[in-house]
């Protein structure tokens, strides 16, 4: 046989044998996936681990077909079940039984005096886990929550050490509408800024009345449940978190430079018939001058460290941590330092007795500084920071040339404003298990807060006026709250389908607070400012208060076959804040849910995994009015009897023993939907929230003889909030083979707010500036609407002035034309109307998470639309009426016929009152913010094993990366009333973080 024939035969035999081998190994693998009851598991994922591109999902009967070879390992997974692996054998048919994932099924939501499985919720509750908080480079837990929960509106002041403003489902009252914060079961007014984000395990936000009614008279504004971390079974583990950051201002409004200001001044004074400054006759020669805003700002720095140790066994578990935060603000001399300590322990002393304790402690120092953003914007760019001799400069000379704004830099270095705070929140509880289905728990809680303010204003001699003596103000404050909760819990399942959980008990809480303050001056030695060294007593004062509350509460949770769910609660509160005849109130609620997907008639398909309808109604209350509003109060005063001055008691406010709780009645309907093997999860809620008996301050006649005629409360107001909210979580792509995963989370909230009625048809005016009010509370309108004149362009000629309604004697071309709304021929108070609404229509956010081979990328967008801002800063900095610097927008002011149709002329004194409160200063407050971008890398365990490190991760993050807005001020987050008073500038934060566990 020739070599060529031998070669061809060999190849043929080899191919034949290979084909036989292949045909023997490749199988058409048929299988069925069922649960422990024998029911088919629909939509379970089946993947061949040898080639993860080969996979399928089970059909409506739980069956599947997949090509596989003998020895291949198939991985079967489904939401709510533990992942199972099977090996392909000789036969291609197999039945796989999936076991329930106990951890998933038992995921608990904290709802007050207990927990409930997430799948059994009937009310509107949203949760944020520690995973959602871990990478946010912020000093305040509230900042980390912004945009994470639908229905929750959070405003960040940006100032180190300040709390955020948080509102849930709109403003339900014109009074205090902050939600109740409960930390580890203890209701507290401890600010979230005192908590260490690294110590938090989860935050549950109770939004509708069926969820919040368990807190009765304090649940009207929603409840924020904070749960700190606890130990778990296993050897002790050390966790270290470190974060280093730099911060810069996100945006600075452009101001006039020296040349621009001089030109403006010349124009303003000429239009008023006043002499201009000869030194500014040629403005261009002055150049840029001093940028005062940049003089008070710098690059802020922040460092944040946490070390924790946790572990335990079946008998005892522990968690202990310490943290340190040091933040230097972007405004010079502003800063915040905080030390935190957390200790949580659980001890199973006996089989039937368990003890637990939680300790949350913080000590902080807040340096508020003596800065003034307004002064920095008003100060003249023609002025130097210091004089030639090194002293602080200041305006000196003709006032309408140089103004009266004190040097904004000097006080930063000469004054001191510091607050020391100490916060202790702790509880200890004992839980007795009488039977598997019956437990009793008793908890004693203690909440102690002490804070001390120290403010020194030093004597100075820089212009325009000197302060000849140093003054020092100090105060000392303390507040102690005690809590004692006792309740039974019955939990049992009857005949496998009827699950019943009942909680009933009592709660007692009492508080006492006091404070003293004093101001001294006339210090004998310039460098010694202890009070003993002061010779002049400026003032001394003090106050104390107390309150108590007794409560009875009960809650019932019932479930039939996980199909029909019912929750009912009742709380009865008695509060010392109201008169003896009105101290007790009842706060019931009920909610139900129907899981349609559990019905036999519901189509079993891959599209819909779970669908649940919810509905609820409840009554809650609000008692945040102070401790003594129901009784008559007195002040001390003096009266002259003959030649003697006698100390007397003066009636301060009139008693109203009939006042009682603000009452909120709220209805909620909701839908929870899970689709495509739980790759798409949607939660939708719609609500109607009515506040009745709102506490309104009633004006009484001055002739009544009371010193204060504006703070007597009466139950007279009604407010309505209605809206809907949704949360959508999706897994857009998940390829186990190459490790790429893409998740998206969307939240959106729409809310409409309206005052239904006040105590009278007379509106309530608030927020005064320049002798006029900016906001108004009026029947039929949203809370805090802006109230003012309506601008209608610019007068271009004298003829236009003459043909319009009378405004002022000095009205001239270049002045603003205001609308004569009542057509009486005169522009006056009767022509003021609603000119804006600070309440947003929509809150929204979107988070995208990407994962690939140890890398992770998060992009978080957040924003609001439909709200407006009253730019009160513009009254002074665009008013063009004084020797204050102006924003660069005044370059486009009216200087002659047709030169402007919106920006008026500059004229000293503003004879036409162009800067009166009008829609000229109302701006669109909508914004879209790239809130956070984080890029992280988790090191492979194989690399860490040699160093005995369990896990390690490094990340880079940018907070407030980009803001898209039409608002002209520093930032559109100006406060809940929508007025920009020159807020502390928001900062952009770049941070480097490191987390490791061993």
Residue ranges with predicted function:
Residues 239-287, 714, 733-838:
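Conserved small-residue
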Residues 142-146, 711-720, 764-786, 835-847, ...:
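C-terminal extracellular loops and terminal segments
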């Amino acid at each position: 046989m020739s070599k060529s024939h031998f070669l061809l035969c060999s190849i043929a035999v080899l191919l034949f044998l290979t084909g036989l081998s292949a045909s023997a190994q490749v199988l058409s693998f048929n299988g069925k996936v069922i649960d422990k009851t024998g029911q088919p598991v629909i939509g379970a994922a089946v993947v061949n681990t040898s080639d993860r591109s080969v996979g399928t999902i089970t059909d409506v009967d739980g069956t599947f077909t997949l090509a596989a070879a003998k020895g291949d390992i198939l991985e079967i997974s489904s939401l709510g079940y533990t992942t199972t692996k099977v090996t392909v054998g000789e036969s291609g048919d197999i039945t796989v039984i999936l076991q329930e994932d106990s951890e998933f099924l038992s995921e608990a939501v904290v709802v007050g005096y207990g927990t409930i499985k997430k799948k059994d919720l009937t009310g509107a509750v949203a949760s944020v886990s520690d995973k959602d908080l871990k990478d946010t480079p912020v000093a305040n837990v509230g900042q980390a929550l912004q945009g994470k929960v639908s229905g929750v509106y959070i405003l960040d002041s940006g100032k180190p050490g300040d709390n955020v403003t948080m509102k849930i489902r709109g403003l339900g009252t014109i009074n205090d509408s902050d939600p109740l914060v409960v930390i580890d079961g203890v209701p507290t007014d401890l600010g979230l800024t005192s908590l260490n984000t690294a110590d938090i395990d989860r935050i549950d936000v109770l939004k509708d009345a069926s969820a919040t009614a368990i807190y009765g008279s304090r649940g009207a504004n929603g409840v924020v449940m904070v749960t700190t971390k606890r130990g778990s079974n296993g050897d002790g583990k050390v966790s270290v978190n470190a974060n280093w950051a730099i911060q810069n201002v996100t945006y600075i409004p452009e101001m006039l430079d020296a040349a621009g200001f001089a030109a403006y001044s010349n124009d303003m004074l000429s239009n008023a018939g006043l002499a201009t400054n000869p030194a500014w006759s040629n403005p261009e020669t002055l150049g840029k001058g001093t940028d005062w805003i940049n003089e008070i700002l710098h690059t802020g720095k922040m460092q944040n460290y946490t070390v924790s140790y946790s572990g335990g066994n079946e008998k005892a578990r522990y968690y202990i941590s310490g943290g340190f935060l040091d933040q230097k603000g972007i405004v010079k001399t502003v800063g915040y330092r905080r030390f935190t300590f957390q200790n949580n322990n659980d001890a199973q002393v006996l089989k039937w007795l368990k003890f637990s304790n939680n300790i949350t402690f913080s000590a902080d120092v807040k340096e508020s500084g003596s800065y003034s953003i307004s002064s920095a914007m008003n100060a003249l760019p023609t002025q130097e920071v210091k004089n030639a001799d090194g002293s602080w400069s200041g305006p000196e000379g003709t006032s309408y040339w140089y103004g009266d704004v004190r040097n904004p830099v000097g006080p930063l270095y000469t004054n001191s404003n510091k607050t020391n705070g100490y916060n202790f929140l702790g509880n200890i509880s004992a839980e007795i298990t009488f039977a598997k289905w019956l437990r009793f728990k008793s908890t004693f809680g203690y909440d102690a807060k002490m804070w001390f303010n120290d403010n020194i204003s030093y004597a100075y001699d820089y212009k325009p006026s000197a302060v000849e003596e140093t003054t020092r103000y100090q105060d000392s404050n303390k507040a102690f709250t005690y809590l004692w909760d006792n309740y039974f819990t019955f939990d049992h399942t009857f005949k496998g389908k009827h699950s019943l959980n009942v909680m009933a008990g009592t709660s007692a809480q009492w508080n006492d607070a006091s404070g003293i303050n004093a101001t001294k001056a006339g210090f004998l030695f310039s460098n010694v400012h202890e009070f003993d060294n002061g010779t002049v007593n400026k003032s001394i004062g003090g106050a104390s208060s107390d309150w108590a509350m007794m409560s009875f509460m009960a809650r019932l949770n019932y479930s039939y076959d996980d199909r029909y769910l019912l929750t009912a609660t009742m709380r009865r509160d008695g509060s010392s804040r109201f008169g003896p005849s009105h101290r007790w109130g009842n706060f019931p609620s009920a909610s139900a849910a129907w899981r349609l997907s559990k019905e036999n008639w519901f189509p079993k398909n891959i599209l819909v995994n779970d669908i649940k309808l919810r509905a609820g109604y409840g009554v809650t209350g609000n008692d945040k009015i102070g401790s003594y509003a129901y009784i008559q109060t007195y002040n001390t005063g003096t009266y002259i009897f003959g030649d003697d001055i006698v100390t007397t008691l003066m009636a301060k406010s009139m008693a109203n023993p009939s006042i009682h709780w603000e009452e909120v009645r709220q209805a909620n309907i909701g839908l929870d939907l899970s689709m495509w093997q739980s790759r798409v999860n949607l939660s939708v809620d719609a609500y109607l929230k009515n506040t009745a008996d709102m506490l309104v301050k009633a004006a009484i006649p001055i002739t009544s003889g009371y010193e204060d005629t504006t703070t007597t409360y009466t139950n007279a107001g009604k407010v309505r909030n209605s809206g809907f909210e949704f949360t959508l979580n999706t897994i857009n792509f998940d390829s186990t083979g190459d490790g790429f995963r893409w998740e998206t989370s969307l939240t959106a909230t729409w809310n409409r707010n309206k005052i239904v009625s006040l105590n009278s048809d007379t509106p309530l005016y608030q927020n005064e500036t320049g002798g006029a009010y900016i906001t108004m509370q009026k029947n039929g309108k949203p809370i805090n609407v802006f109230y003012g004149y309506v601008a209608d362009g610019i007068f271009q000629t004298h003829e236009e002035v003459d043909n319009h309604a009378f405004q002022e004697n000095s009205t001239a071309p270049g002045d603003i034309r205001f609308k004569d709304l009542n057509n009486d021929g005169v522009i006056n108070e009767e022509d003021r109307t609603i000119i804006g609404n600070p309440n947003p229509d929509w809150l929204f956010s979107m988070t995208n998470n990407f994962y690939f081979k140890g890398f992770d990328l998060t992009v978080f967008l957040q924003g609001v639309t439909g709200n407006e801002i009253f730019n009160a800063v513009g009254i002074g900095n665009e008013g063009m009426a004084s020797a204050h610097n102006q924003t660069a927008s005044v370059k486009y002011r009216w200087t002659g016929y047709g030169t402007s149709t919106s920006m008026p002329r500059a004229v000293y004194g503003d004879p036409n009152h162009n800067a009166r409160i009008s829609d000229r200063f109302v701006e669109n407050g909508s914004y879209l913010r790239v809130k956070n971008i984080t890029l992280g890398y988790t090191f492979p365990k194989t690399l860490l094993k040699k160093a005995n490190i369990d896990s390690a991760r490094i990340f880079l993050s940018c907070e407030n990366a980009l803001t898209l807005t039409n608002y002209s001020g520093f930032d559109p987050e100006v406060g809940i009333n929508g007025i920009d008073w020159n807020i502390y500038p928001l900062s952009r934060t770049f941070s480097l973080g490191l987390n490791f566990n061993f």
